[in-house]
């Protein structure tokens, strides 16, 4: 049996401001820092230790991982950062206020952009500040495969090769793994691990800064999964995520 821990980054500044964030690099809020510390303490209290950590190349996920590991006394852990674990790219919606966008375009349209499986948001142009090709951290990535805007389906197609090629072999080799990433890159992994349908995943909301613990069999099929922390508080956080696209 293997154990795998997934954690969405703590609250970011644009989470707080209810903006579409995607690949834009924003920092954690004070609440987000506190969530990361709490996550680390919960994992420590539950007796977790890790051999390998994975995260995206975005500050909010990197910082969440570092803070949690420091709380556990495992700040020395090997960490691999990769763009394939980044958040879904929100295209031309990046930076827009979700509630204002819903008021302008209608809640149903924003729900389609946020929660449909295979409909991407409007794409950014290559000369946009939000096109990843202008960011030096992606210099070694072919510009043709960098996203201009992604649906959840496209995000899954980006994330899963990294799971199969890198993370899965480490787990099967006996390494204890933690992944700190983002709402949609983690939805991609949860959908795959749980065998969720395209329709089922639309209702999946992942709270910020809460460790999700999987027990997996020898084929990496889930035996069990649970969030660490107060169940009522976690449900409230999930409900808040679901309501982000509503007009004020």
UniProtKB/Swiss-Prot annotation:
PROSITE patterns: PG_MUTASE. The active site is at residues 9, 87. Pathway: Carbohydrate degradation; glycolysis; pyruvate from D-glyceraldehyde 3-phosphate: step 3/5. Coiled coil: none annotated. It catalyses: (2R)-2-phosphoglycerate = (2R)-3-phosphoglycerate. It comes from the Bacteria. Its EC number is 5.4.2.11. Keywords: Gluconeogenesis, Glycolysis, Isomerase. GO terms for biological process: gluconeogenesis; glycolytic process. The record marks 182 as: Transition state stabilizer. Belongs to the phosphoglycerate mutase family. BPG-dependent PGAM subfamily. NCBIfam families: pgm_1, PRK14115.1. Homodimer. Catalyzes the interconversion of 2-phosphoglycerate and 3-phosphoglycerate. This is 2,3-bisphosphoglycerate-dependent phosphoglycerate mutase. It comes from Alteromonas mediterranea (strain DSM 17117 / CIP 110805 / LMG 28347 / Deep ecotype).
């Amino acid at each position: 049996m293997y154990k795998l821990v997934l954690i969405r980054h703590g609250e970011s500044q644009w989470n707080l401001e209810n903006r579409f964030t995607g690949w834009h690099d924003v920092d954690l809020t004070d609440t987000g820092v506190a969530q990361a510390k709490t996550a680390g303490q919960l994992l420590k209290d539950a007796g977790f230790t890790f051999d390998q950590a994975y995260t995206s190349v975005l500050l909010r996920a990197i910082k969440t991982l570092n803070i949690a590991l420091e709380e556990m006394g495992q700040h020395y852990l090997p960490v691999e950062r990769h763009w394939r674990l980044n958040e879904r790219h929100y295209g031309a919606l990046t930076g827009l206020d979700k509630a204002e966008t819903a008021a302008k375009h209608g809640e149903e349209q924003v729900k389609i952009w946020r929660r449909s499986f295979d409909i991407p948001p409007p794409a950014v142009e290559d000369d946009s500040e939000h096109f990843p090709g202008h960011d030096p951290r992606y210099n070694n990535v072919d510009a043709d495969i960098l996203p201009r805007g992604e649906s959840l389906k496209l995000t899954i197609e980006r994330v899963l090769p990294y799971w199969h090629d890198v993370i899965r072999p480490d787990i099967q080799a006996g390494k204890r793994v933690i992944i700190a990433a983002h709402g949609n890159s983690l939805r991609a992994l949860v959908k795959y691990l749980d065998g969720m349908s395209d329709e089922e995943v639309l209702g999946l909301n992942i709270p910020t800064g809460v460790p999700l613990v999987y027990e997996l069999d020898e084929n990496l099929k889930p035996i069990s999964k649970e969030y660490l922390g107060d169940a009522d508080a976690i449900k409230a956080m999930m409900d808040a995520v679901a309501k982000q696209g509503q007009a004020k």
